[in-house]
Design a protein with these regions (language model features):
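C-terminal accessory module of base-excision DNA glycosylases/AP lyases that mediates lesion recognition
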Residues: 92-187
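Short, well-structured alpha-helical segments
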Residues: 25-28, 64-74, 115-122, 137, ...
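Buried hydrophobic packing segments
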Residues: 10-11, 73-77, 140
């Protein structure tokens, strides 16, 4: 997968956060156009003035923080490309048993990729990961793995360990384990 498609997916995830996906998806062709089809080498050169002009473009969602994240995330991709050859190679080499570490890396090196954005982007990109949805967190609490939504490194460590153990026992991908765990919660 070319890096421009990863940048497009990252931006799509960022813009979908907190909004109806259908609203973002309906405008996505316009995003592709104004961000030069998410070519990281072009996007990284976008000036603050250019981003300000995009705030006037009614064809896209005009959220300054999210718009500013696109060039920053392009820089992250270019930095990763320099070290690993491509963003896809970077994702492929990341150990499967350290999803939380990958989430933290993306949140720290990128912009607007905290919370559930990194794991949801990874799912969109085809990288196996679990997602801490409300139901998954409720199931983890019910199994005494955590006492509340895990956010700190310390709280996330036992979650990663539990998913690693379940994967070793079952042979199932983390995405399936996450979904199965969510189904154990009674509403």
């Amino acid at each position: 997968v070319p890096d421009d498609r990863y940048l497009s997916l990252i931006a799509l995830r960022v813009f979908r956060a907190g909004l109806r996906h259908s609203v973002v998806d309906a405008k996505w062709a316009n995003f592709e156009e104004v961000f030069w089809h998410f070519d990281p080498e072009k996007v990284v050169l976008m000036s603050a003035e250019h981003i300000e002009r995009l705030m006037q473009d009614t064809r896209i969602i005009r959220h300054l923080g999210k718009l500013k994240s696109v060039p920053r995330n392009a820089q992250m991709l270019l930095d990763i490309r320099q070290e690993f050859g491509s963003f896809g190679a970077f994702l492929a080499q990341w150990p499967e048993d350290d999803c939380v570490g990958l989430w933290r890396y993306l949140a720290k090196q990128g912009q607007q990729l905290g919370g559930l954005s990194a794991p949801r982007f990874l799912r969109m990109a085809g990288k196996d990961t679990f997602v801490l949805s409300d139901d998954v967190v409720a199931a983890l609490v019910a199994q005494d793995i955590v006492t509340k939504r895990p956010t700190s490194q310390r709280d996330l460590a036992p979650v990663q360990e539990a998913f690693n153990a379940w994967q070793a026992q079952s042979g199932r991908p983390l995405c399936q384990l996450s979904m199965l765990l969510a189904l154990t919660v009674n509403h």
